[in-house]
Amino acid sequence: MKDLLKSVLRIMGLLAVSMVCLTGYLAIQNKLTARDILSFMQERYVQDEAGYVEELRKGMLARQACIRINYRGTLQEDMEKKALDMLEMVFETNEPDIPDDADYLEYTYQGVSAELISFFGIYQVTYHFDYLETQEETEYTGRQVEAILSELDIKDTDDYTKVKKIHDYIVKELDYDEGLSRATPYEALTTGKATCQGYATLFYRMAEEAGVPCRIIGGTADGQPHAWNIVKLDGLWYNIDCTWDDPVGKGVDKYKIRHEFFLKSDNRSFLMHIRDGKYQTSEFQKKYPMAKKDYVRN
C-alpha cells in the first residue's frame, strides 16, 4: 500500500479535473489529495459505451440527482463530447416495457452539468441532474395513465382508435397553462393544466402504454418554442398536436374537440411547425419516415 501511495504521489500532477456544463464548457484545474487519486484508480469501470449508457440510464430512471460513471477508454477520446453523446444515447434507448424512458426521460429533466476526471484513458464522469418530476411523481403518473387507458377501453382496438381516444381525452381534460409553469404529465394530471411540453409528454406516455409507437418532437410553431408528437400508423409517421387542437381564448367552447392537427403530414397544417435540428437529420428521417399525405382511415 505504501509503494502504491508513493506512486500516486508521483503522478498527482498528471491527473486533470474539469467541469463540463452541458450548455457549454468550462475547464478548471484542481488539486487532489493522494487519497482522492488512489480511490479513483481503485473504482470499478465500465468497459464500453453500452455499459456507460446503461449505467447512466439506470440512474436517470431512478431520478438520481448525482450519477457517477467510471469509464475505461483511450487517451485520444474527447470525453467532454462523449459525456454529451452518451446522454443522447440514453434518450434514444426505448424499451417497450419501460414507458418512462427515452423521450419521457428527456422531456422530464430540466438541466445537467458534469464533472470530469481523467488519467491516461481512465475517466470518471459525475453528472448532476435537475428533474422536472420526482420518481414518486413519475410512478403516480404511470398509475394514473393505466387507470385512464382502462377507462378508455382501448386495449383490443386498432391503433387509430387508440390514438384518437388518447388525443380526445387530453384535449377534453386539459387546459393550456398560460402561466407556462406546468410542463410535466404529473402536473397535467393533478392540476388539469399544462404547457405544450406537458401535453406532448402525456400523449407520449399514454401512447407508449397503449402500444402505439410515438415520439416527442421539439421545435417551434408560429415562431414560438413548441412540442408536439409523431405516431406510427400503417408503417408511416404522422404529426399530432394536442395543444393546438385544444381551443383557448375568450368565447371558445373549451369542451369542443378539434382534429385540425391530428394525424397530419408535414404539409399544409404543419407548415408552421419547424423541428429542432436533431429531428431534421437524414438519419432521423430515415428511421421515422413521414407520410406524404394526411392520414385517411379506410
Language-model features, listed with the residues they occupy:
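Periplasmic OmpA-like peptidoglycan-binding domain that tethers envelope proteins to the cell wall
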Residues: 188-197
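N-terminal accessory/pre-domain segments preceding catalytic cores
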Residues: 4-157, 268-298
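Hydrophobic/aromatic-rich core segments of domains that either
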Residues: 198-268
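Secondary-structure boundary elements
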Residues: 134-188
